[in-house]
Amino acid sequence: MRWNKKNVISLVSKSHHLPAPITPPLPEIYRIPNPPPKLPEISIPPTLTLSPSPKHSNFVNFLENNLPHHQTLTPQTLLGFLRSKIRNHPLYAHYDFAVFNWAATLDTFRHDHDSFLWMSRSLAATHRFDDLYRLLSFVAANPCPCSSGIFSCPELEPIFRSAIDAYCRARKMDYALLAFDTMKRLIDGKPNVGVYNTVVNGYVKSGDMDKALRFYQRMGKERAKPDVCTFNILINGYCRSSKFDLALDLFREMKEKGCEPNVVSFNTLIRGFLSSGKIEEGVKMAYEMIELGCRFSEATCEILVDGLCREGRVDDACGLVLDLLNKRVLPSEFDYGSLVEKLCGENKAVRAMEMMEELWKKGQTPCFIACTTLVEGLRKSGRTEKASGFMEKMMNAGILPDSVTFNLLLRDLCSSDHSTDANRLRLLASSKGYEPDETTYHVLVSGFTKEGRRKEGEVLVNEMLDKDMLPDIFTYNRLMDGLSCTGKFSRKQVRML
Protein backbone atom coordinates (compact mmCIF):
# COMPACT_ATOMS: atom_id res chain seq x y z
CA MET A 1 0.00 0.00 0.00
CA ARG A 2 1.42 3.38 -0.97
CA TRP A 3 0.83 6.19 1.49
CA ASN A 4 -0.34 9.51 0.04
CA LYS A 5 -2.17 12.58 1.26
CA LYS A 6 -5.53 10.98 0.61
CA ASN A 7 -4.62 7.96 2.74
CA VAL A 8 -3.34 10.14 5.56
CA ILE A 9 -6.33 12.49 5.53
CA SER A 10 -8.66 9.49 5.57
CA LEU A 11 -6.75 7.94 8.47
CA VAL A 12 -6.64 11.14 10.50
CA SER A 13 -10.24 12.08 9.81
CA LYS A 14 -11.28 8.77 11.34
CA SER A 15 -8.91 9.08 14.26
CA HIS A 16 -11.75 9.32 16.76
CA HIS A 17 -13.92 6.55 15.34
CA LEU A 18 -13.50 2.80 15.34
CA PRO A 19 -14.94 0.97 12.33
CA ALA A 20 -18.51 -0.19 12.49
CA PRO A 21 -19.12 -3.65 13.98
CA ILE A 22 -18.32 -6.40 11.51
CA THR A 23 -21.23 -8.57 12.62
CA PRO A 24 -25.01 -8.09 12.65
CA PRO A 25 -26.51 -6.30 15.67
CA LEU A 26 -25.94 -8.27 18.85
CA PRO A 27 -28.32 -9.17 21.64
CA GLU A 28 -28.66 -6.43 24.24
CA ILE A 29 -26.65 -8.40 26.78
CA TYR A 30 -23.50 -7.96 24.70
CA ARG A 31 -23.88 -4.25 24.14
CA ILE A 32 -22.09 -1.75 26.33
CA PRO A 33 -24.67 0.42 28.11
CA ASN A 34 -25.15 4.05 27.23
CA PRO A 35 -22.62 6.36 28.89
CA PRO A 36 -23.53 8.15 32.12
CA PRO A 37 -26.01 11.03 31.65
CA LYS A 38 -23.44 13.82 31.94
CA LEU A 39 -20.35 13.15 29.88
CA PRO A 40 -17.27 14.80 31.38
CA GLU A 41 -15.41 17.41 29.41
CA ILE A 42 -12.49 15.59 27.80
CA SER A 43 -9.71 17.38 25.99
CA ILE A 44 -9.12 15.54 22.71
CA PRO A 45 -5.48 15.40 21.55
CA PRO A 46 -4.83 17.72 18.61
CA THR A 47 -5.07 16.14 15.14
CA LEU A 48 -3.93 17.20 11.70
CA THR A 49 -6.24 19.41 9.71
CA LEU A 50 -7.92 17.86 6.69
CA SER A 51 -6.31 20.32 4.30
CA PRO A 52 -2.92 19.36 2.87
CA SER A 53 0.03 20.73 4.78
CA PRO A 54 3.74 20.00 5.22
CA LYS A 55 2.82 17.92 8.26
CA HIS A 56 0.86 15.55 6.01
CA SER A 57 3.88 15.03 3.81
CA ASN A 58 6.08 14.37 6.82
CA PHE A 59 3.59 11.87 8.19
CA VAL A 60 3.41 10.14 4.78
CA ASN A 61 7.18 9.75 4.75
CA PHE A 62 7.15 8.52 8.33
CA LEU A 63 4.56 5.81 7.58
CA GLU A 64 6.23 4.72 4.33
CA ASN A 65 9.57 4.33 6.08
CA ASN A 66 8.37 2.57 9.23
CA LEU A 67 4.99 0.85 8.86
CA PRO A 68 4.98 -2.62 7.23
CA HIS A 69 2.93 -3.14 4.06
CA HIS A 70 -0.74 -3.71 4.86
CA GLN A 71 -0.74 -7.16 3.20
CA THR A 72 1.97 -8.38 5.57
CA LEU A 73 0.73 -6.48 8.61
CA THR A 74 0.10 -8.66 11.68
CA PRO A 75 -0.86 -7.73 15.25
CA GLN A 76 2.75 -8.39 16.28
CA THR A 77 4.30 -6.16 13.60
CA LEU A 78 1.71 -3.45 14.29
CA LEU A 79 2.54 -3.59 18.00
CA GLY A 80 6.23 -3.35 17.19
CA PHE A 81 5.55 -0.22 15.14
CA LEU A 82 3.36 1.37 17.83
CA ARG A 83 5.83 0.60 20.60
CA SER A 84 9.11 1.48 18.94
CA LYS A 85 8.15 4.16 16.39
CA ILE A 86 4.98 5.92 17.52
CA ARG A 87 4.87 5.71 21.31
CA ASN A 88 7.67 8.16 22.12
CA HIS A 89 7.65 10.17 18.90
CA PRO A 90 7.55 13.93 19.66
CA LEU A 91 5.11 14.69 16.79
CA TYR A 92 3.10 11.56 16.06
CA ALA A 93 2.61 9.86 19.44
CA HIS A 94 -1.06 10.90 19.60
CA TYR A 95 -1.79 9.15 16.28
CA ASP A 96 -1.40 5.67 17.76
CA PHE A 97 -5.15 5.20 18.09
CA ALA A 98 -5.71 6.43 14.53
CA VAL A 99 -3.25 3.86 13.18
CA PHE A 100 -4.83 1.21 15.40
CA ASN A 101 -8.28 2.04 14.00
CA TRP A 102 -7.03 2.07 10.41
CA ALA A 103 -5.57 -1.42 10.82
CA ALA A 104 -8.96 -2.70 11.98
CA THR A 105 -10.49 -1.67 8.63
CA LEU A 106 -8.15 -3.90 6.61
CA ASP A 107 -9.70 -7.10 5.25
CA THR A 108 -6.50 -9.05 5.86
CA PHE A 109 -5.96 -7.86 9.44
CA ARG A 110 -7.49 -8.81 12.78
CA HIS A 111 -6.46 -7.38 16.16
CA ASP A 112 -5.59 -9.90 18.86
CA HIS A 113 -5.71 -9.74 22.67
CA ASP A 114 -2.21 -8.27 22.89
CA SER A 115 -2.92 -5.36 20.55
CA PHE A 116 -6.19 -4.55 22.31
CA LEU A 117 -4.48 -4.73 25.70
CA TRP A 118 -1.61 -2.49 24.61
CA MET A 119 -4.01 0.09 23.16
CA SER A 120 -6.16 0.03 26.28
CA ARG A 121 -3.14 0.61 28.51
CA SER A 122 -1.79 3.35 26.26
CA LEU A 123 -5.07 5.27 26.22
CA ALA A 124 -5.47 4.81 29.97
CA ALA A 125 -1.93 5.99 30.74
CA THR A 126 -2.38 9.15 28.65
CA HIS A 127 -5.87 9.91 30.04
CA ARG A 128 -7.59 9.74 26.65
CA PHE A 129 -10.83 8.64 28.22
CA ASP A 130 -13.12 9.33 25.25
CA ASP A 131 -11.00 7.13 23.00
CA LEU A 132 -10.78 4.53 25.75
CA TYR A 133 -14.56 4.41 25.93
CA ARG A 134 -14.72 3.93 22.14
CA LEU A 135 -12.21 1.11 22.33
CA LEU A 136 -14.21 -0.72 25.00
CA SER A 137 -17.40 -0.20 22.99
CA PHE A 138 -15.75 -1.79 19.97
CA VAL A 139 -14.57 -4.78 22.05
CA ALA A 140 -18.07 -5.23 23.47
CA ALA A 141 -19.79 -5.01 20.07
CA ASN A 142 -17.51 -7.37 18.13
CA PRO A 143 -16.47 -11.00 18.42
CA CYS A 144 -13.56 -11.92 20.65
CA PRO A 145 -10.13 -11.73 18.98
CA CYS A 146 -9.84 -15.48 19.65
CA SER A 147 -12.49 -16.38 17.08
CA SER A 148 -15.23 -14.69 15.07
CA GLY A 149 -17.80 -16.99 16.68
CA ILE A 150 -16.91 -16.19 20.30
CA PHE A 151 -18.32 -13.26 22.25
CA SER A 152 -17.47 -14.36 25.81
CA CYS A 153 -13.84 -14.83 26.75
CA PRO A 154 -11.95 -14.55 30.07
CA GLU A 155 -8.95 -13.15 28.16
CA LEU A 156 -10.86 -9.88 27.79
CA GLU A 157 -10.56 -9.11 31.52
CA PRO A 158 -7.05 -7.53 31.40
CA ILE A 159 -8.20 -5.16 28.61
CA PHE A 160 -11.01 -3.84 30.78
CA ARG A 161 -9.00 -3.97 33.99
CA SER A 162 -6.50 -1.36 32.80
CA ALA A 163 -9.39 0.89 31.78
CA ILE A 164 -11.20 0.44 35.10
CA ASP A 165 -8.03 1.31 36.99
CA ALA A 166 -7.55 4.48 34.91
CA TYR A 167 -11.16 5.57 35.41
CA CYS A 168 -10.88 5.03 39.17
CA ARG A 169 -7.64 7.00 39.40
CA ALA A 170 -9.30 9.86 37.53
CA ARG A 171 -12.31 9.67 39.88
CA LYS A 172 -14.59 8.81 36.93
CA MET A 173 -16.49 6.22 38.91
CA ASP A 174 -19.57 6.10 36.64
CA TYR A 175 -17.35 5.07 33.75
CA ALA A 176 -15.43 2.62 35.94
CA LEU A 177 -18.66 0.89 36.99
CA LEU A 178 -19.87 0.87 33.39
CA ALA A 179 -16.66 -0.79 32.24
CA PHE A 180 -16.82 -3.29 35.13
CA ASP A 181 -20.37 -4.38 34.34
CA THR A 182 -19.56 -4.73 30.65
CA MET A 183 -16.44 -6.76 31.41
CA LYS A 184 -18.38 -9.03 33.76
CA ARG A 185 -20.86 -9.90 31.01
CA LEU A 186 -18.18 -10.40 28.36
CA ILE A 187 -15.97 -12.76 30.34
CA ASP A 188 -19.02 -14.85 31.29
CA GLY A 189 -17.61 -15.60 34.70
CA LYS A 190 -16.45 -14.16 37.99
CA PRO A 191 -13.90 -11.33 37.73
CA ASN A 192 -10.68 -11.49 39.68
CA VAL A 193 -11.02 -10.08 43.20
CA GLY A 194 -8.35 -7.52 42.30
CA VAL A 195 -10.77 -5.83 39.88
CA TYR A 196 -13.39 -5.58 42.63
CA ASN A 197 -10.72 -4.07 44.88
CA THR A 198 -9.87 -1.48 42.25
CA VAL A 199 -13.47 -0.25 42.17
CA VAL A 200 -13.80 -0.29 45.97
CA ASN A 201 -10.57 1.70 46.27
CA GLY A 202 -11.81 4.15 43.65
CA TYR A 203 -14.92 4.89 45.69
CA VAL A 204 -12.87 5.24 48.89
CA LYS A 205 -10.39 7.65 47.26
CA SER A 206 -13.36 9.62 45.91
CA GLY A 207 -14.67 9.97 49.47
CA ASP A 208 -17.81 7.92 48.82
CA MET A 209 -17.74 5.27 51.54
CA ASP A 210 -21.42 4.42 51.08
CA LYS A 211 -20.89 3.29 47.49
CA ALA A 212 -17.67 1.54 48.47
CA LEU A 213 -19.60 -0.50 51.05
CA ARG A 214 -22.40 -1.27 48.60
CA PHE A 215 -19.88 -2.56 46.10
CA TYR A 216 -18.24 -4.62 48.87
CA GLN A 217 -21.65 -6.12 49.69
CA ARG A 218 -22.13 -6.82 45.99
CA MET A 219 -19.00 -8.96 46.13
CA GLY A 220 -20.75 -11.25 48.60
CA LYS A 221 -23.84 -11.53 46.42
CA GLU A 222 -21.70 -12.41 43.42
CA ARG A 223 -19.69 -14.94 45.46
CA ALA A 224 -16.44 -13.03 45.06
CA LYS A 225 -14.48 -13.64 48.25
CA PRO A 226 -12.92 -10.46 49.68
CA ASP A 227 -9.20 -10.70 50.41
CA VAL A 228 -6.95 -8.82 52.81
CA CYS A 229 -6.59 -5.95 50.31
CA THR A 230 -10.38 -5.48 50.21
CA PHE A 231 -10.56 -5.10 53.98
CA ASN A 232 -7.47 -2.88 54.13
CA ILE A 233 -9.00 -0.49 51.60
CA LEU A 234 -12.24 -0.19 53.59
CA ILE A 235 -10.44 0.11 56.93
CA ASN A 236 -8.34 2.90 55.46
CA GLY A 237 -11.51 4.64 54.29
CA TYR A 238 -13.03 4.51 57.77
CA CYS A 239 -9.81 5.74 59.39
CA ARG A 240 -9.55 8.65 56.96
CA SER A 241 -13.04 9.73 57.98
CA SER A 242 -12.24 9.14 61.71
CA LYS A 243 -14.83 6.36 62.02
CA PHE A 244 -12.62 4.15 64.14
CA ASP A 245 -15.42 2.09 65.69
CA LEU A 246 -16.53 1.01 62.21
CA ALA A 247 -12.91 0.37 61.25
CA LEU A 248 -12.49 -1.93 64.26
CA ASP A 249 -15.79 -3.68 63.47
CA LEU A 250 -14.52 -4.38 59.97
CA PHE A 251 -11.19 -5.53 61.41
CA ARG A 252 -13.03 -8.06 63.58
CA GLU A 253 -15.23 -9.11 60.66
CA MET A 254 -12.08 -9.68 58.67
CA LYS A 255 -10.79 -12.19 61.23
CA GLU A 256 -14.19 -13.84 61.60
CA LYS A 257 -14.26 -14.52 57.85
CA GLY A 258 -10.90 -16.26 58.05
CA CYS A 259 -8.91 -13.45 56.46
CA GLU A 260 -5.72 -12.88 58.44
CA PRO A 261 -4.75 -9.21 58.90
CA ASN A 262 -1.34 -8.28 57.56
CA VAL A 263 1.10 -5.52 58.46
CA VAL A 264 -0.79 -3.05 56.24
CA SER A 265 -4.00 -3.72 58.19
CA PHE A 266 -2.32 -2.90 61.49
CA ASN A 267 -0.35 0.06 60.13
CA THR A 268 -3.53 1.60 58.77
CA LEU A 269 -5.29 1.35 62.13
CA ILE A 270 -2.25 2.48 64.14
CA ARG A 271 -1.71 5.50 61.88
CA GLY A 272 -5.39 6.38 62.10
CA PHE A 273 -5.43 6.24 65.89
CA LEU A 274 -2.21 8.21 66.36
CA SER A 275 -3.07 10.90 63.83
CA SER A 276 -6.31 11.50 65.75
CA GLY A 277 -4.54 11.71 69.11
CA LYS A 278 -5.72 8.27 70.28
CA ILE A 279 -2.27 7.28 71.52
CA GLU A 280 -3.25 4.47 73.88
CA GLU A 281 -5.42 2.79 71.25
CA GLY A 282 -2.62 2.99 68.69
CA VAL A 283 -0.01 1.52 71.02
CA LYS A 284 -2.46 -1.18 72.14
CA MET A 285 -2.99 -2.15 68.51
CA ALA A 286 0.78 -2.44 68.08
CA TYR A 287 1.03 -4.89 70.97
CA GLU A 288 -1.92 -6.87 69.60
CA MET A 289 0.06 -7.09 66.40
CA ILE A 290 2.92 -8.70 68.36
CA GLU A 291 0.58 -11.16 70.07
CA LEU A 292 -0.85 -12.30 66.74
CA GLY A 293 2.66 -12.92 65.42
CA CYS A 294 2.45 -10.29 62.68
CA ARG A 295 5.93 -9.04 61.85
CA PHE A 296 6.70 -5.40 62.57
CA SER A 297 7.84 -3.40 59.57
CA GLU A 298 10.05 -0.33 59.47
CA ALA A 299 6.94 1.68 58.60
CA THR A 300 5.17 0.40 61.74
CA CYS A 301 7.96 1.71 63.97
CA GLU A 302 8.11 5.05 62.17
CA ILE A 303 4.34 5.50 62.55
CA LEU A 304 4.53 4.79 66.29
CA VAL A 305 7.58 6.96 66.96
CA ASP A 306 6.36 9.89 64.87
CA GLY A 307 2.90 9.72 66.43
CA LEU A 308 4.24 9.73 70.00
CA CYS A 309 6.76 12.50 69.28
CA ARG A 310 4.07 14.61 67.62
CA GLU A 311 2.14 14.49 70.90
CA GLY A 312 5.25 15.52 72.86
CA ARG A 313 5.79 12.04 74.33
CA VAL A 314 9.39 11.59 73.24
CA ASP A 315 10.36 9.63 76.37
CA ASP A 316 7.49 7.22 75.75
CA ALA A 317 8.67 6.76 72.17
CA CYS A 318 12.17 5.99 73.43
CA GLY A 319 10.81 3.48 75.95
CA LEU A 320 8.63 1.84 73.29
CA VAL A 321 11.59 1.37 70.95
CA LEU A 322 13.64 -0.26 73.72
CA ASP A 323 10.70 -2.50 74.67
CA LEU A 324 10.32 -3.62 71.06
CA LEU A 325 14.05 -4.30 71.04
CA ASN A 326 13.80 -6.47 74.15
CA LYS A 327 10.87 -8.36 72.62
CA ARG A 328 13.03 -8.95 69.53
CA VAL A 329 10.47 -7.50 67.15
CA LEU A 330 12.28 -4.25 66.25
CA PRO A 331 13.18 -4.39 62.53
CA SER A 332 16.92 -4.29 61.90
CA GLU A 333 16.42 -1.66 59.19
CA PHE A 334 14.60 0.78 61.50
CA ASP A 335 16.33 4.17 61.46
CA TYR A 336 16.00 5.84 64.86
CA GLY A 337 17.76 9.04 63.78
CA SER A 338 14.56 11.10 64.03
CA LEU A 339 14.03 9.94 67.62
CA VAL A 340 17.61 10.92 68.50
CA GLU A 341 16.98 14.33 66.99
CA LYS A 342 13.80 14.78 69.04
CA LEU A 343 15.57 13.80 72.27
CA CYS A 344 18.48 16.15 71.60
CA GLY A 345 16.02 18.91 70.73
CA GLU A 346 14.53 18.54 74.22
CA ASN A 347 17.99 18.71 75.81
CA LYS A 348 17.95 14.96 76.52
CA ALA A 349 21.14 14.07 74.68
CA VAL A 350 22.33 11.76 77.47
CA ARG A 351 19.06 9.81 77.26
CA ALA A 352 19.53 9.59 73.50
CA MET A 353 23.07 8.28 73.99
CA GLU A 354 21.91 5.63 76.45
CA MET A 355 19.23 4.48 74.03
CA MET A 356 21.65 4.37 71.10
CA GLU A 357 24.23 2.40 73.06
CA GLU A 358 21.58 -0.12 74.13
CA LEU A 359 20.37 -0.50 70.55
CA TRP A 360 23.92 -0.70 69.24
CA LYS A 361 24.85 -3.35 71.76
CA LYS A 362 22.02 -5.56 70.49
CA GLY A 363 22.89 -5.25 66.82
CA GLN A 364 20.98 -2.11 65.78
CA THR A 365 23.87 -0.19 64.19
CA PRO A 366 23.08 3.54 64.02
CA CYS A 367 23.26 5.48 60.79
CA PHE A 368 25.65 8.34 60.10
CA ILE A 369 22.98 11.01 60.66
CA ALA A 370 21.96 9.58 64.03
CA CYS A 371 25.59 9.57 65.17
CA THR A 372 26.39 13.12 64.10
CA THR A 373 23.08 14.35 65.55
CA LEU A 374 23.97 12.82 68.91
CA VAL A 375 27.51 14.27 68.90
CA GLU A 376 26.07 17.71 68.17
CA GLY A 377 23.46 17.29 70.90
CA LEU A 378 26.04 16.28 73.50
CA ARG A 379 28.41 19.06 72.46
CA LYS A 380 25.77 21.79 72.57
CA SER A 381 24.61 20.66 76.00
CA GLY A 382 28.15 21.04 77.36
CA ARG A 383 28.92 17.31 77.58
CA THR A 384 32.08 17.51 75.51
CA GLU A 385 33.80 14.49 77.06
CA LYS A 386 30.78 12.24 76.38
CA ALA A 387 30.65 13.57 72.82
CA SER A 388 34.36 12.78 72.41
CA GLY A 389 33.88 9.27 73.76
CA PHE A 390 30.98 8.59 71.41
CA MET A 391 32.92 10.05 68.48
CA GLU A 392 35.74 7.62 69.23
CA LYS A 393 33.29 4.70 69.37
CA MET A 394 31.63 5.56 66.05
CA MET A 395 34.99 5.96 64.29
CA ASN A 396 36.15 2.59 65.61
CA ALA A 397 32.97 1.16 64.08
CA GLY A 398 33.89 2.68 60.72
CA ILE A 399 31.44 5.60 60.87
CA LEU A 400 33.47 8.70 60.00
CA PRO A 401 32.17 12.18 60.88
CA ASP A 402 31.75 15.13 58.58
CA SER A 403 34.35 17.89 58.80
CA VAL A 404 32.03 20.45 60.43
CA THR A 405 30.97 18.18 63.31
CA PHE A 406 34.52 16.95 63.79
CA ASN A 407 36.15 20.39 63.87
CA LEU A 408 33.52 21.84 66.19
CA LEU A 409 34.10 19.01 68.66
CA LEU A 410 37.88 19.55 68.51
CA ARG A 411 37.35 23.27 69.09
CA ASP A 412 35.25 22.58 72.20
CA LEU A 413 37.87 20.15 73.52
CA CYS A 414 40.66 22.68 72.97
CA SER A 415 38.59 25.44 74.59
CA SER A 416 38.29 23.29 77.72
CA ASP A 417 42.08 22.64 77.80
CA HIS A 418 41.82 19.13 76.35
CA SER A 419 43.94 19.73 73.25
CA THR A 420 45.78 16.44 73.75
CA ASP A 421 42.48 14.54 73.64
CA ALA A 422 41.49 16.50 70.56
CA ASN A 423 44.74 15.59 68.81
CA ARG A 424 44.26 11.95 69.77
CA LEU A 425 40.87 12.02 68.01
CA ARG A 426 42.58 13.49 64.95
CA LEU A 427 45.12 10.68 64.88
CA LEU A 428 42.37 8.06 65.26
CA ALA A 429 40.33 9.66 62.49
CA SER A 430 43.36 9.75 60.19
CA SER A 431 44.02 6.05 60.82
CA LYS A 432 40.40 5.31 59.76
CA GLY A 433 40.69 7.21 56.49
CA TYR A 434 39.51 10.68 57.53
CA GLU A 435 41.45 13.57 55.97
CA PRO A 436 41.87 16.52 58.40
CA ASP A 437 41.58 19.92 56.74
CA GLU A 438 43.24 23.27 57.46
CA THR A 439 40.60 24.16 60.04
CA THR A 440 41.41 20.99 61.98
CA TYR A 441 45.09 21.94 62.24
CA HIS A 442 44.42 25.60 63.05
CA VAL A 443 42.08 24.58 65.89
CA LEU A 444 44.67 22.21 67.35
CA VAL A 445 47.58 24.64 66.99
CA SER A 446 45.54 27.33 68.72
CA GLY A 447 44.70 24.87 71.50
CA PHE A 448 48.31 23.87 72.06
CA THR A 449 49.36 27.54 71.98
CA LYS A 450 46.85 28.43 74.67
CA GLU A 451 47.97 25.50 76.83
CA GLY A 452 51.68 26.29 76.37
CA ARG A 453 52.43 23.02 74.54
CA ARG A 454 55.00 24.35 72.09
CA LYS A 455 56.47 21.02 71.01
CA GLU A 456 53.11 19.44 70.08
CA GLY A 457 52.10 22.59 68.25
CA GLU A 458 55.31 22.74 66.20
CA VAL A 459 54.76 19.15 65.07
CA LEU A 460 51.34 20.12 63.71
CA VAL A 461 52.65 23.26 61.99
CA ASN A 462 55.34 21.21 60.25
CA GLU A 463 52.66 18.69 59.15
CA MET A 464 50.69 21.56 57.67
CA LEU A 465 53.82 22.67 55.81
CA ASP A 466 54.38 19.15 54.45
CA LYS A 467 50.74 18.97 53.25
CA ASP A 468 50.89 22.40 51.54
CA MET A 469 48.27 23.80 53.89
CA LEU A 470 50.22 27.01 54.52
CA PRO A 471 49.73 29.62 51.82
CA ASP A 472 53.04 31.40 52.44
CA ILE A 473 56.04 31.68 54.74
CA PHE A 474 54.46 34.53 56.66
CA THR A 475 51.65 32.28 57.90
CA TYR A 476 54.21 29.66 58.92
CA ASN A 477 56.28 32.22 60.83
CA ARG A 478 53.19 33.65 62.51
CA LEU A 479 52.16 30.23 63.84
CA MET A 480 55.68 29.35 64.97
CA ASP A 481 56.13 32.74 66.64
CA GLY A 482 52.89 32.23 68.45
CA LEU A 483 54.06 28.85 69.77
CA SER A 484 57.40 30.33 70.87
CA CYS A 485 55.52 32.87 72.97
CA THR A 486 53.18 30.37 74.61
CA GLY A 487 51.75 31.65 77.83
CA LYS A 488 52.30 35.32 76.85
CA PHE A 489 49.08 35.77 74.86
CA SER A 490 45.56 36.25 76.04
CA ARG A 491 42.87 33.77 74.91
CA LYS A 492 41.56 36.31 72.39
CA GLN A 493 45.04 36.81 70.93
CA VAL A 494 45.53 33.05 70.59
CA ARG A 495 42.32 32.74 68.56
CA MET A 496 43.70 35.37 66.16
CA LEU A 497 46.81 33.31 65.37
UniProtKB/Swiss-Prot annotation:
InterPro entries assigned to the protein according to its UniProt record, in alphabetical order: Pentatricopeptide_rpt, TPR-like_helical_dom_sf
Alphabetical list of Gene3D superfamilies matching this protein: Tetratricopeptide repeat domain
Stored SUPFAM superfamilies: HCP-like
Keyword list, A-Z: Repeat
PPR repeats: 156-186, 192-226, 227-261, 262-296, 297-331, 332-366, 367-401, 402-436, 437-471
Domain of life: Eukaryota
Family: Belongs to the PPR family. P subfamily.
NCBIfam families listed in its UniProt record: PPR
UniProt-recorded name of the protein: Pentatricopeptide repeat-containing protein At2g36240
Organism field: Arabidopsis thaliana
UniProt lineage: Eukaryota, Viridiplantae, Streptophyta, Embryophyta, Tracheophyta
